[in-house]
């Protein structure tokens, strides 16, 4: 079995993990976890330029990662448009992809008009990417998720932030 381990909504990630962990424990079927951002970028791994995989995280923040030639240029993080721009090569074509990536792409073009930015109005099917990445993980004999592993949260929840105050 395979699931997106995040980033994503707190509730959605917890529900996915709870459901698949129950099946895993009942039937001894391993679970492989794949990054949501990696799934969005996967169809463009041969793109001649940089691929920014994003999810609008609200509050002027984005969950983002940058890839080039199937290599990670910027690790996944909860970040700002300015931080993402600092990792970009201004001499390369830049492709935006991901959930609601149009929001990010529009802001990127406005903030850094010198960049050669492209995006598509519709993205590929992330489910196909999810299964392709999982098949590769199995072929490469990568470890499935451990029993104690859970979602990948790049941001603290509102409740955690309230406790810190």
Regions found by a protein language model. Give the residues of each.
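Catalytic-loop motifs flanking and including active-site residues across diverse enzymes
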Residues: 15-16, 80, 126-130
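Acyltransferase
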Residues: 119-165
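Buried hydrophobic packing segments
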Residues: 19-23, 40-44, 130, 134
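Long, hydrophobic/aromatic N-terminal blocks
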Residues: 1-7, 76, 81
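Glycine-rich, flexible loop/turn motifs
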Residues: 6-13, 51, 75, 149-150, ...
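DPxDG-like acidic metal-binding loop motif
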Residues: 2-31
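Surface "functional belts" at beta-alpha junctions
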Residues: 30-124, 153, 163
